[in-house]
Amino acid sequence: MQNVRDCTAVIITQFQEICMKKTIAIVGLLGGFACALPAQAQFAKPEDAIKYRKSSLTVMAAHFGRLGAMAQGKVPFDAKVAADNADVLATVAKLPWAAFGEGTDKGETRAKPEIWKESAKFKDAADKAQAELGKVVAAAKTGNLDALKAAMGPAGSSCKACHDNFRKD
């Protein structure tokens, strides 16, 4: 039985490493675009901004989820994998916010109108989420599972609060 667990852990780790390499390449491209152009100039059409923010939020959720799975004991804790996911999370957590500009409230989006009606409240929620995710990143890089566990709860609550207030189900 122990051999099966060991094999499973190795397979999960290898899968995570393969996914990480592909994700790092994608994030690198996204990051390059994000840094190369002013926020509004990035998007030729509102649909482009919506796609961009949805993609960056999806990547952010994937890496947060991987860290959460380790914190919850659903997958074995691996300090290197945690740090690698944290590196991606640190970059991606900065990306989606510029894509909530004017005209991006319509189309294929679950964004609520409150994002634009209560823009200061939305900015505060986004800033809080980024701050909490920064704590997750720092905790993951320590290699200490307990530190990661402690940081995940507040970050998850921050994400949930933003979703509850600003995202349609």
Which role fits each region the language model picked out?
Residues 43, 47-79, 85-169:
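Sequence context surrounding c-type heme c attachment/ligation sites in exported
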Residues 5, 17, 33, 157-160:
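Secreted/extracellular small peptides and ectodomain modules produced from precursors
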